[in-house]
Regions:
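N-terminal transmembrane alpha-helices
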Residues: 2-33, 37-38, 54-66, 101-108, ...
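Transmembrane helical elements of multi-pass membrane transporters/channels
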Residues: 12-31, 138, 149, 172, ...
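Alpha-helical transmembrane segments and their lipid-water interface positions
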Residues: 24, 28-31, 35, 57-64, ...
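Small-residue-rich hydrophobic transmembrane alpha-helices
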Residues: 43-109, 146-165, 264, 275-341, ...
Length: 452
């Protein structure tokens, strides 16, 4: 039976989240274009410095998404136990903020004390290292603003506040664009700072974003009701539950990030042609998963709130709807990729060999996206929202490290298969997880009790 209210609710949550992801992609593309105008050395320095910052970003996402499981569940409980649920909500946000600040401090100290050593992990080129160190000087402070705005945004989304963070992201995009243009190229009477200007522009944009998001959470939001005085509240009675539910998400996302870098290293050693072809397809991959990411987060929010209300049967039915939605979005994404692959590849001035490899990769991506959409909405959405975070942590990493990376190495370096099959092997964990999560879903063991 078609439940129009359910799909309207999912669309209400997923659309702003997807648009916010699209804006983030746009910001990254603009940064690349602007810094790219300075030269290859400058572009490489900023790109490699951001590789380290992206690790921090992924860890913050893990902190936020882990906390969101509890926040959504407690928000759903407010009808039955309003006082206890409201207190648990504030305690969860307090722990989330404290963990984020601690993590930001660790990364900031790393960039302050040994920026050169960090850059040398990625390159041996002295000019690139020197410029990367310059970029890190401004990014030390950026870490705190980036982390706080990110986790507070996820927290607000978990109680249905999805539009306000979207509008703030649009504002931050405009601020970032203007600040980068002014400081990179020395416009509007500002000094020409080049790489340092790119870092300063990002710092200003993150300061704006964090000020508005955190200001709203601390002074205006009435759903969570978190205020400045709550930053000092006692949370010891909820730390155990936070660790049990949230930390596996943080560990899972962190290890997956390392695994993703390992896959990138494998691709990097398959030759210039494969690397160039993969670069051509990267934007298409990002664009095709924007809506999927939105539905993933909507799945976690809806599932958590429904279980918080105590309606287990309804959550099971909604899980089935999310499964069908994942398959449908995957098929639509596959059609989109195949439709745009030709024009995108032809827009690049590359050799015939690179164009052929890119075409093979596009076909492989269009196949994998069906499985990726389905399992992502199930694992990062429904099952995570159900509190099944420990099992997800194990499944994510077993399928990646035991299946996809060994198969990718075998296909690329031993069997020397075509680009299509190498990519399919590197992403085979997506296929395996799809069947695993369907089995897990039917078993019903994914729904975990959460203590208030």
């Amino acid at each position: 039976m078609f439940d129009s209210k359910f799909y309207k609710r999912v669309a209400f949550l997923a659309t702003p989240i997807a648009l916010q992801s699209l804006i983030t992609i746009g910001v990254n593309m603009l940064d690349t274009i602007m810094v790219g105008n300075l030269g290859e050395t400058e572009l490489s320095a900023v790109s490699l410095a951001n590789q380290f910052i992206n690790i921090y970003h992924i860890f913050c996402m893990g902190i936020g998404m882990g906390a969101s499981v509890l926040i959504a569940r407690y928000w759903g409980m407010k009808k039955e136990e309003p006082e206890r649920a409201a207190l648990a909500l504030r305690k969860t946000v307090c722990i989330m903020i404290r963990v984020t600040v601690a993590l930001a401090l660790i990364f900031a100290l790393g960039m302050l004390l040994c920026p050169g050593s960090i850059m040398r992990m990625y390159t041996t080129e002295q000019d690139i290292i020197r410029l990367g160190v310059v970029y890190f000087r401004y990014s030390i402070v950026t870490c705190f603003f980036l982390g706080l705005s990110l986790v507070c945004t996820i927290g607000l989304r978990s109680v249905g506040q999805v539009h306000m963070p979207l509008f703030v992201s649009i504002g931050a995009f405009i601020v970032n664009l203007c600040a980068n243009y002014a400081f990179i190229f020395g416009k509007f009477g500002m000094p020409r700072m080049e790489v340092a200007g790119a870092a300063l522009g990002t710092l200003i944009a993150r300061l704006f974003e964090a000020s508005v998001i955190c200001g709203y959470l601390l002074f205006a939001d009435k759903r969570i009701g978190f205020r400045c005085r709550d930053l000092l509240m006692k949370t010891s009675d909820l730390v155990g539950e936070y660790v049990r539910i949230s930390i596996p998400v943080l560990i899972s996302d962190g290890i997956l990030a390392i695994g993703g870098n390992t896959v990138a290293m494998v691709i990097g050693r398959l030759g210039v042609t494969f690397v160039a072809a993969n670069a051509i397809t990267s934007v298409t991959q990002q664009m095709s998963t924007v809506l999927i990411q939105g539905v993933c987060q909507a799945g976690a929010i809806v599932t958590g709130q429904t279980l918080g209300e105590g309606d287990r049967e309804k959550a099971q039915k909604q899980a089935g709807s999310f499964l069908r939605l994942g398959i449908g979005l995957g098929l639509l994404s596959a059609v989109f990729i195949m439709a745009v692959s030709g024009p995108i590849i032809s827009s690049y001035n590359v050799s015939e060999e690179t164009a052929e490899v890119a075409a093979q990769l596009m076909k492989a991506i269009s196949l994998i996206i069906v499985f990726q959409a389905t399992n992502s909405i199930m694992t990062k959405g429904v099952l995570r929202g159900g509190g099944d975070t420990k099992m997800l942590m194990l499944a994510d990493n077993i399928f990646l490290w035991v299946l996809s990376i060994p198969l990718g190495l075998l296909a690329g370096f031993v069997l020397h298969w075509s680009a299509f099959w190498i990519y399919v092997c590197l992403k085979s964990d997506q296929i395996a997880k799809t069947f695993w999560c369907i089995i897990r879903l039917r078993g019903g063991k994914w729904i975990k009790k959460i203590r208030v």
